[in-house]
């Protein structure tokens, strides 16, 4: 399966026009797709979902005029025979203090004994001119890296409509903040899981955007609760929510992964109520599967690994109502601050209107590093092998943390669901204790109950810190803090040394017991 797809893209590259060159050249996913234009339906128009700010934001004339390659009427790049720029305030490369960059990295399967691979990039080279990489870039990214990412998206997700685009971002957090502003005005509502990524919550709060939390179970957001809350929406609360932010795989903080059937039901509700979906999926490739069997020491074959990945919302999106955010922070390195998003061309163009006067483009250093690693050194096969290797490594770490929890956290103290993806274990503290300061727990008012729960959570957090173990409070992730019920805590198996889990969980267990 993978080998045939790679062969198809190799042939497609060999018969395609050369990549656009020069400073900040216009480029587009349309140049690199295997599927011919016009073979799938077009996306819907989303003007009615855009914020006032987004509708008023226009492309940057200065950025458009500065591009060395521009689109023609048919969308194809116009490449002039000769061009002298007396317009752009772009420094001449002779004044850049760097001439070359040399990176050393791992083979794709990630073995620590692998011989290092050297990846140079030099000024004036045909492959990716380092001088061009260091200059102002095009908002969608460099043609070299965008080609690889477009192929990757088509290979893995194959969006079922025609006019989809991928563009690079300066990290998913930055892209997420921009997308919220594109779709929401002050006073609007967005939908999230009842426990959600704090970065999203903290991004929308100062924008005056309200959050509607939807109940969750072991598979994440519950579509029946979503449908019920939308169907019974009271217009006195404001405009009915039209945007939903979700993390469908290894959800942060709960670790829940939505099944294929769950996703189809949620997408159907979105279609019926005209909801635009922000699919934030940094843990998609960290598929953990069941717990490792004794003697299972190697990652699974790449085709089997790919078959077991769940269908993304992008892969089932027939109307262009999904913007998918992919991250490098969990699969390459957080400091790259270079990721990608995929959506219909209308939304991609609106997004680039923002970046042209904001981040402009992802770092040229990061784009070079990613291109030289992903395309030149690994290729698509090597990239997938790396992802399968990472999944296997995190699977071992997940198993080690769960084993330590089974050893020190009895079910009368905590319960949890073993995560199928991601980096997190979500602990549910069983019934709070008599130390809650009410005449009787059942008689506490809602406000007293909330105060008591937060107080106990704070004491557990501080006691754990005193014992040398950092945990995350569940209240940090509550989409609607006023609806807080019970005490939940998040542990991660991503950071600490593997051999420290046993000690850390024991200390944490002692900290909890000392406060009960």
Q: Model segments located where?
A:
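Conserved core segment of the aminotransferase class I/II
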Residues: 5-33, 311-395
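Conserved PLP cofactor-binding pocket of PLP-dependent enzymes
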Residues: 83, 450, 459-490
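N-terminal small-domain helix-loop-helix segment of the aminotransferase-like
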Residues: 37-170, 515
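Eukaryotic N-terminal low-complexity, Ser/Thr- and Lys/Arg-rich leader segments
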Residues: 1-75, 79, 228-240, 294-305, ...
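Conserved glycine-rich beta-strand-loop-beta hairpin in the small C-terminal domain of fold type I
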Residues: 387-402, 413-432, 438-447
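PLP-dependent enzyme catalytic core of the Aspartate aminotransferase-like
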Residues: 466, 479-516
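Conserved core of the PLP fold type I
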Residues: 14-15, 20, 26-29, 109-274, ...
């Amino acid at each position: 399966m993978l080998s045939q797809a790679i062969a198809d893209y190799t042939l497609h590259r060999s018969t395609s026009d050369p990549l656009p060159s020069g400073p900040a050249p216009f480029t587009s996913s349309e140049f690199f797709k295997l599927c011919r234009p016009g073979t799938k339906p077009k996306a819907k128009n989303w003007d009615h979902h855009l914020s006032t700010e987004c509708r008023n934001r226009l492309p940057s004339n200065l950025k458009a005029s500065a591009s060395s390659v521009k689109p023609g009427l048919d969308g194809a790049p116009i490449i002039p025979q000769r061009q002298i720029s007396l317009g752009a305030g772009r420094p001449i490369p002779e004044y850049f203090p760097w001439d070359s960059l040399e990176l050393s990295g791992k083979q794709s399967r990630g073995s620590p004994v692998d011989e290092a691979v050297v990846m140079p990039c030099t000024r004036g080279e045909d492959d990716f001119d380092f001088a061009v990489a260091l200059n102002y870039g095009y908002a969608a990214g460099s043609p070299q890296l965008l080609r690889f990412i477009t192929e990757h998206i088509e290979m893995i997700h194959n969006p079922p409509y025609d006019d989809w685009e991928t563009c690079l971002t300066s990290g998913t957090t930055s892209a997420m903040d921009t997308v919220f502003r594109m779709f929401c005005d002050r006073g609007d509502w967005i939908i999230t899981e009842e426990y959600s990524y704090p970065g999203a919550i903290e991004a929308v709060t100062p924008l005056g955007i309200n959050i509607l939390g939807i109940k969750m179970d072991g598979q994440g957001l519950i579509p029946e609760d979503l449908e019920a809350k939308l169907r019974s929406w009271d217009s006195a609360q404001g405009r009915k929510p039209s945007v939903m932010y979700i993390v469908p795989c290894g959800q942060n903080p709960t670790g829940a992964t939505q099944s294929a059937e769950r996703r189809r039901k949620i997408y159907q509700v979105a279609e019926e109520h005209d909801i635009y979906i922000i699919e934030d999926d940094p843990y998609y490739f960290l598929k953990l599967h069941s717990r490792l069997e004794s003697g299972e020491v190697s990652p699974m074959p790449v085709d089997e690994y790919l078959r077991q990945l769940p269908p993304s919302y992008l892969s089932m999106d027939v109307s262009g109502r999904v913007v998918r955010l992919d991250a490098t922070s969990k699969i390459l390195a957080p400091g790259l601050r270079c990721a990608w998003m995929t959506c219909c061309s209308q939304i991609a163009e609106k997004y680039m209107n923002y970046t042209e006067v904001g981040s402009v483009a992802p770092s040229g250093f990061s784009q070079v590093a990613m291109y030289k690693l992903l395309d030149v050194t690994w290729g698509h096969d090597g990239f997938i092998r790396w992802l399968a290797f990472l999944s296997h490594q995190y699977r071992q770490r997940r198993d080690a943390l769960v084993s330590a929890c089974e050893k020190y956290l009895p079910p009368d103290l905590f319960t949890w669901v073993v995560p199928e993806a991601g980096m997190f274990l979500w602990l549910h503290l069983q019934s709070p204790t008599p130390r809650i300061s009410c005449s009787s727990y059942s008689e506490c008012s809602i406000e007293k109950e909330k105060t008591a729960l937060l107080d106990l959570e704070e004491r557990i957090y501080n006691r754990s810190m005193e014992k040398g173990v950092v945990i995350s409070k569940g209240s940090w992730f509550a989409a609607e803090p006023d609806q807080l019920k019970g005490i939940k805590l998040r542990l991660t198996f991503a950071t600490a040394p593997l051999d420290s889990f046993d000690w850390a969980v024991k200390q944490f267990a002692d900290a909890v017991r000392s406060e009960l």
